[in-house]
């Protein structure tokens, strides 16, 4: 902090110049921008944001020609690179940028010094020249630095407006030069007085008769110079006209944009238009706080408010003359002493200038000699190093890349191999491997073979099909169908996370909800080629791109965003950029990003070759003169990115830092695939501006470098122009190196960008730029010739790239997409990390390894051993930290505690050398064992217990200290000296002893919880029961301390010390009594049983002498006895004196129900509620026997304890642990502390034990106290247990499809349709075109011809407008026909099929064509699914010529197969109501209140809309009462064709509703007719019978939501029983004048035209090729149809599964069985053969071997997900007749549980 700023006697001038500092302006603005992103410069950031907003606002108001001169910008920094000088906005931009710079530097100076506002009125005065006065005005109006951020932005507004206005006026005086040459509007003349210059100008202006507006005038003057202003041509003429001026010393000033200080030109109205605009947000009444000197008078402006001040300034700038002498005089006057106390003066300025130096010299000359004048620079702060940036927001953060992984060509399956490949300069070019496709058939260099590739070359990864399916919980079947890109995305994501040390949830930034995935992918080879040969259950999740990311999120349980991006060749780096954007936006805290490409499809080779993308000669020849295209490549890469501050907080290794990332598009390119230098350069500038980086500082660029003539030329131009410009030139030590990884490994397309990034990251790690191998002959002549002069070029040899001391290297990575996208990343070195050295290391360290299979675990151990052999110097502490805290852990585990690397190596070798090692590996159980805390009594007390934990772990220390403070507040002594071992060895008092033990135990219990141990129950031994009750929440910790302390005090007060003693006897209570029977009979001794610890371990107590006698007696009988080191005999009569008082004290303590079960040694039971826990309990626990053995037995009996339960002994020494092991020999008992052992080592050993038992302790908490002392090691990656899941492309069908010549006209599907045999043929359903039947699903496609005689006659039975119109009864019959047919195909022995036709909707009326001999085809598609007992149907028009279906269906419906008894029951409840209404109608007809219509009259009324043929006229009579009616119906006896239910019968029993709407007096049938837009359901309890009599009833009513729509239910009765119902039939009112429009016959034989494929399901009738189901599409406008033809909306029903295989069946590679994670007992064959059948079926469907289905194998591990469980469930039912719901796989999660269920219930 500058001390002068705190001097209250200091007189200060702040001078705001009208000139920019002499520094590099771009660099100044970059630094301002970067500082503004630091939270230490909050106000600077606000000012820049406000200024940017104001400039945007002002630019938006400009006239269009001016507005177009300003490029879009997000910050003022973006405008620094734009040259406005030659345009009309030069003055505006220069003025506003100068204002921004000076005020930004001013604000930043104060924030950098972290000083208070110290500009005191009277002591501080402001001065400035020209535009500088506006910046000074912002300070003058401010009373704090925060004010400057607001007022400063308004000063920017005025500066901009002033510049625009002046330029506009000035161009009206003289137009700019047509060639863009800049001319000065002002000259300075020296060694002449103002008067003499004025005389010369007056003579010129008068003599040339100049107009007043264009005269030359004096704009500024001082003692030594005069500034002359005017139009440039007029100034030139004036100097030529006047000999005095011509020969004077003069020079032009850099004033190019117009006139200011011209009183003859501007008036008050001009000033008002700039200053007093209504858009200004300045508070007009804001007070002037500081004096601001006028540049004309040298005196302060008189204005008192903001509006007046800006008005005065505007007047001076436009009309006033600058007099520097007056300014100097004003400054001197302010700095002259006002009192004796004032002794120092200071001028603050922005660097210095000629003018400022003159002012400074003049001021020094005028000041008194006792005045000390200093000058302070307000710019110098900007170059200071303020240490690591503290981001002001997430958007200001730098990003850290912390992990990476790859699968790249040339065997580069890891980073080391990739680097070796680069370092050696290897080329991975090869020909296409046979497992991709056969070059013998698919390669034709001549290009004559259609669909063949013209190049045989590529770059391919090794073993693309190898995958550890079991690790990722996938079945072999699912793995095989899953795209290798998806699989390797999973693998590399895991490896990158492993390298980064990411354990989801370990830190806030790695919480699963804050992790997202971003991957680039540009092809679907596997889905389109390999997997499509045999489409299975997993076709969609295995092939659709979105599942690649989704699978990563699902496996790791990340719930952040998941994006799959396609930007062609830049997809990988664009995904990284999207990830960076998400991090900057705060959408995620950790991002996994990458690019994916695995080549299998020859079609893409052919397409790219035909488009001239690919080289026919081999590898990418980047920058070579013979570059002829790129060479394709596989590639998979993943990186893990965090914000830098998060990575540092997480103790991550940082590979490099991302400063900026951007993507734009080459919109101005000559073609969509041609690169554009301008767009690339704009993207570079965006990234550089975002980071505030000087492009000259970038020293390495990884080029996109495809090796094409256009691409190389354009990229070399853009890179050299921005990063190595002609001026300013790079210094000799600023060499810019270039590289292109495509010359090594080819163009990975979607993975190209990620490969480039991985190379750049390795360059940072290795400090070496690998040599470029792309130039095979000589450099491409299109590359700029002057690259060497610009100090830029390719690294042709392996070139060291050392990190400069104290600096960071900058690198750029480019990736461009063929579609025009450009993505650029800017990187810098990671911050230098100084590892904190610990004062002492831990004695032992936990080393952990895990895997999901035995094979992988053994391999991981081998890898670690190999690593240690190669790196014996490895830090054991770092290794423990890495393997424990920074690894995800799995169910196959190895753990050990070692004290040296050599000891670990020995341990690993001994394990691996054991031939039975693999077979001895056991997985940890799926369900972690329970953990019980056992709290010891005071017998384990010693000084220094837990001291290491107290010193090492802040949490434990805080717990002890908090509890200790509670004890002290209760009046008890501090126990901390005991814990720290700062107490003398003399025996401690009972109070200190017991409090120390209880406080230690409560703290230890909480510490175990911190370490991730979930407690199942507690048990306390004697004193330990108080700690147990506190931990269980029965009493508070404070109450436990209080009771223990007071009890100890009572013991001291009431009980004689050393009068009694306690004896531990190695015998049971009964045995002791038997052995002492003689002594007891003689009453020579007495004792009491204090503790029954085990069945053979008893503690007795009593008077000291008698206990000694007992000891001697028992020892004489060879019984082991030990006198306990306690001063009292607890749990004996000695405690009687304290019991009443103790109980009284305890009654004041609240007891609560335990939060976890309490195992009670007093009651020998498990306590779950508070009923048994009260003050009396504590009384009894003090006096009565501690029956520890019985308590444990009770816990076992109640199921709380089993053989797997883990016991943690909580206390100073593991006493309870020994007791537990005596009771349960197999029990695992862990000590917390142990006498004479480092307690950290004890805890470590316990954590390893817990880990191996199946718990996952919180290692992060264990290492947290000293995490900065540890480093994350780059250990060998996880060793996968891989199997090759590869579906080879068989045959030549990609070539064969080209043989279908475009000119060949296919036969229509109807050619001979009536003659071809069909399994299903009726009057309406004519031909099956496709059919597939599986276990639980069936799909059927049929074709019908409406012109077929039977169909046509059915249509003509229902005519409208003299046209035959298909009634919905036709669709009903077709639906029932297909429904019964398919249902019987799946369930062949069904007696009757009862169908409910629901959701009937028709979009278009089907009108019969009147063209003779025409074909009018219809297509019906149906898909039945037994799992839902439903069948979806959709009807489509088809083209009579081509057979192509319309894109959208004209009708849809759903059939539901239901239980008719349910209908019968429902209708039985309604029948009396319907019959009642019928009776009422009959009665009203008799009374003449309702109309009774005969058949002729009824159908005559119908003719208002529809004319029915005789067979349709089934209604004998009708009673009509407004909108309610009933009809007597007799069906005609003839069927007239082959039907399921004849349409004329359906119509007869149901069209009463149409009569009500179109024949009732309640309807306006003159102007309207009514049509039905569908119904909700149609069902018949039994089939309609020929000639049978029925009754129909309906009541229609308007819908409240739509008055033009009516609805009602049509009931069909036979006798008294309801036998059918049309539910919610709807009718819409339609104007009659639309009849012709909707019901006219088609004019051509083609009623549907081919349309482009839609999203989702589309198909041709002749071609059953299928895609994913379509989503419902928005409904088109309603189309009205006949009364019985529904018309509402169209929707695409979900398409059925594929009907036909489109290629030969793939040959599946032989699968090796997955190594199961357990060497467990196989599921034994059982007598019930159903079990083995089920197992075989599961194995077959999942692709596993039956042997893999072990009893403890979980379905999750086997990859049986919800989809597979549905498949299995249906297979069980269809093949084995076993009803197993899919939910059972959740209820029985393992094979063993499932087989047990089958045995029990099947």
Curated annotation (Swiss-Prot):
The modification O-(pantetheine 4'-phosphoryl)serine is found at residue 1762. Pfam families: Acyl_transf_1 (PF00698), CurL-like_PKS_C (PF22621), ketoacyl-synt (PF00109), Ketoacyl-synt_C (PF02801), PP-binding (PF00550), SAT (PF16073). Binds 1 phosphopantetheine covalently. The keyword Signal does not apply. PROSITE patterns: CARRIER (PS50075), KS3_1 (PS00606), KS3_2 (PS52004), PKS_MFAS_DH (PS52019). Residues 1322-1641 are annotated as: Product template (PT) domain. The keyword DNA damage does not apply. Disulfide bonds: none annotated. Residues 1326-1462 are annotated as: N-terminal hotdog fold. Residues 27-261 are annotated as: N-terminal acylcarrier protein transacylase domain (SAT). Residues 935-1235 are annotated as: Malonyl-CoA:ACP transacylase (MAT) domain. The active site is at 569 (for beta-ketoacyl synthase activity), 704 (for beta-ketoacyl synthase activity), 747 (for beta-ketoacyl synthase activity), 1358 (proton acceptor), 1547 (proton donor). Residues 1725-1802 form the Carrier domain. Residues 1702-1713 have a biased composition (Low complexity). InterPro entries: Ac_transferase_dom_sf, ACP-like_sf, Acyl_transferase_dom, Acyl_Trfase/lysoPLipase, Ketoacyl_synth_AS, Ketoacyl_synth_C, Ketoacyl_synth_N, PKS_Beta-ketoAc_synthase_dom. This is Non-reducing polyketide synthase nscA.
